[in-house]
């Protein structure tokens, strides 16, 4: 069984799901893929302040039509995967980068309205210690980490561009904090080769 790597570059990144996306990699069942990912906002570094903020540099070039969702790596085609089959994803490890961010409020969303956070956004910039698995924000608050991938999935057999925001039967924006290192995710395959 082979080990493959995917780095974030134009040919491996997309901001939507689609059955029409060409795979950036084709693997055999049982192979391992190491993904190096960007954050949800396509951020590639910190601001000049040394912290993450809304001025942090983003991946470029972005296509407004195709890259409006989360920064996804792939898709990966699995030889022999066919609609009606189940894909097992084994999450062997998740190693966070050296920084991260938390952003809440600042736009009219149902949750923000209920919490009265529509007008005033709150931004926390985190320095991450991946060995100690802790993160410390700009206010000195430290939290223990248990990293998980927010978005994992494959396209449905629908034509066109599908948003990364909603979860679907084939995966997507699951935000399942239980999907940590050592766990497995089972998803139904809807298109030829899966395109994970």
For each of these PLM feature ranges, what is it?
Residues 8-18, 65-73, 162-170:
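Short, structured beta-strand/loop micro-motifs enriched in basic residues and often containing a Trp
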Residues 40-52, 94-104, 193-196:
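Short, Lys/Arg- and Gly-enriched loop/turn segments at beta-strand edges
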Residues 35, 86-89, 187:
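A generic structural signal for residues embedded in beta-strands
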Residues 70, 93-181, 186:
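Intrinsically disordered, low-complexity linker/loop segments enriched in Gly/Pro
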Residues 1-64:
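N-terminal, Lys/Arg-enriched amphipathic/low-complexity engagement segments
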Residues 13, 21-23, 72-77, 175:
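Short, conserved secondary-structure segments in the cores of folded domains
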């Amino acid at each position: 069984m082979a080990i493959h790597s995917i780095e974030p570059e134009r040919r491996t990144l997309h901001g939507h799901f689609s059955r029409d996306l060409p795979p950036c990699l084709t693997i055999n069942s049982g192979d391992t893929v190491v993904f190096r990912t960007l954050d949800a906002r396509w951020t590639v570094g910190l601001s000049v302040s040394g912290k993450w903020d809304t001025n942090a540099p983003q991946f470029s070039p972005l296509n407004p039509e195709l890259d409006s969702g989360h920064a996804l790596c792939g898709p990966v085609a699995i030889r022999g995967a066919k609609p009606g089959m189940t894909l097992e994803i084994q999450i062997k490890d998740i190693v966070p980068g050296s920084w991260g961010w938390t952003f809440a409020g600042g736009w009219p969303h149902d949750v923000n309205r209920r919490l009265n956070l529509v007008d005033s956004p709150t931004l926390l910039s985190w320095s991450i210690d991946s060995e100690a698995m802790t993160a410390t924000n700009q206010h000195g608050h430290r939290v223990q980490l248990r990293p998980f991938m927010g978005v994992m999935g494959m396209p449905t057999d629908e034509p066109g561009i599908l948003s990364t925001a909603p979860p679907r039967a084939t995966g997507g924006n699951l935000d399942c904090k239980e999907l940590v290192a050592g766990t497995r995710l089972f998803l139904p395959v809807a298109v030829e080769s899966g395109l994970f």
